[in-house]
C-alpha cells in the first residue's frame, strides 16, 4: 500500500469540533489520507445511539462500525497505515487491542478527551486481574 493514511479510531460520536481538534485539514493539506473509524456502536451502543446529534461530523472520512467482524476486516486491509487510538483500554475494547497486536499494527495511543469508562465493573474484575497488559500489547 503506497498511500499515506492516518486512521483515527474513536469510541464516541465524532463532532465537527473533533474534526478541528484532530487537525484533519492539516493532515489532508500535507497529502495524507484520513479515515475516522468510529467503534462507538460496538463499544458503547446506548451512549452512541442517545448522544447529541447536533454538530456531528457526517462526512465521507468517517466509517462507523456496527460489527466486530467489519472492524477486523478493515484493520486487516489497512494494517500498514498509522493508527491513532483515541479509546480506553478496558473489557469492551480489549478485542481491538488484541487484533492490533496480532496484526503488528503501528499505533499511537491517546486518552485525552475520550469517553470515561469504569473498568472496575464487578463481572469484569476477574478479566482485569487475569490480563497482563504487557503481554497484550507489544510496545
Descriptions of predicted regions:
Residues 3:
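Phosphate-coordination loops involved in phosphoryl transfer and adenosine-cofactor binding
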